[in-house]
């Protein structure tokens, strides 16, 4: 059986004990592979992504334990974490008060003993996509079951920047989408229709101004940047405040 070397720790591995990556490197399953999240597709990952993901978990777990986990027990409604997940899988905790979201895996060293958690922490404001999809999968009895997922993609993120979160029902997926929509101020309700209309008008004015400046031959970089920012705020919601909250927390962990 062919022998290879783990590109991270240097351990000798074979086809059974090693995981081959997309760039041809191998990592050991026993140690380095276990450091990664189950949600990470190691087959299509390259070595730099694996090492960045491991560093992402080390930092994220520290932030989870020191900042977010204590908020689970907070008596303040404004500080409470919003939890989304399914039994046996990773859970997503959304913290509007800190501007952070954490994907958390729970592990046990022996059966139900030696519980420990590891986490990837993201800035909510970096969330680029949160889309619902469903899949038909076989259960333990061989019968087909419909599984519900939310696909999340984050900008400005090294390591695992995208993952599929399995939730128990379509209703739970809708609740997660609503949670993010409310944070970004883009929920489709009468109460927020004026805010949405204002963002749309600001975007249209900026684009119109940029077009006029271009026609007059005096378009500058600031006008383009402003127009792009206003269009982005209309499509994605104004994320200035939620990003500022996250950066205030993360500054302590750089």
Q: What does each model-found stretch correspond to?
A:
Residues 1-60:
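N-terminal cysteine/histidine-rich coordination modules
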